[in-house]
């Protein structure tokens, strides 16, 4: 079985994340969308909330599993029997950081590949940080996140449609 791991904080999941999922799901028999537990970040949504949101927006994909992990992504991927880690790239600046991570992962796990997918142009400006900033000023999240995610963000920030 070909297993891929798409790790991230997904705080919140964006249309850019969804684009990468939708394009990578067919590359593997099973795709694990792995929510990182990062104690150093102050998340908008708890890990449990992010898992619930992801399960909701990804329910139409029978070969996707949503899970959580802490520690090194490469260790988690190996524990899951993955053949690859999936990463999305928005800009050259993303590649620079991802390149270092991929080289480190290759050193730690020589048989584990890193698969990069370029985010579609219409999503290249979207990041979870940008979404949270727009939401903090009660701006429209249309086109940035799935509708159910927009509603949950608006609930967190105390404003409606």
From Swiss-Prot:
Annotated residues for binding of ATP: 9-10, 17, 88-90, 98, 123-129
EC numbers on record: 2.7.7.3
Record field: catalytic activity: (R)-4'-phosphopantetheine + ATP + H(+) = 3'-dephospho-CoA + diphosphate
Localization per Swiss-Prot or TrEMBL: Cytoplasm
Keywords: ATP-binding, Coenzyme A biosynthesis, Cytoplasm, Magnesium, Nucleotide-binding, Nucleotidyltransferase, Transferase
Swiss-Prot/TrEMBL site (Transition state stabilizer) positions: 17
Subunit structure of this chain's protein: Homohexamer.
HAMAP family: PPAT_bact
Protein name per its UniProtKB record: Phosphopantetheine adenylyltransferase
Taxonomic path: Bacteria, Bacillati, Bacillota, Clostridia, Eubacteriales
Gene name tied to this protein: coaD
């Amino acid at each position: 079985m070909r297993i891929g791991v798409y790790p991230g904080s997904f705080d919140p999941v964006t249309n850019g994340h969804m684009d990468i999922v939708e394009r990578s799901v067919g590359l593997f028999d099973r795709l694990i969308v792995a929510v990182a537990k990062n104690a150093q970040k102050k998340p908008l949504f708890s890990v449990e909330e992010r898992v619930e949101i992801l399960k909701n927006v990804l329910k139409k994909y029978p070969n996707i599993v949503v899970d959580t992990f802490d520690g090194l992504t490469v260790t988690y991927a190996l524990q899951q029997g993955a053949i690859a880690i999936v990463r999305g790239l928005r800009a050259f600046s993303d590649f620079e950081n991802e390149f270092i991570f991929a080289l480190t992962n290759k050193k730690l796990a020589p048989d584990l590949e890193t698969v990069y997918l370029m985010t579609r142009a219409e999503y290249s400006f979207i990041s979870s940080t940008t979404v949270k900033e727009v939401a903090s000023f009660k701006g429209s999240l249309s086109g940035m996140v799935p509708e159910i995610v927009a509603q949950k963000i608006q609930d967190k920030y105390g404003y409606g449609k």
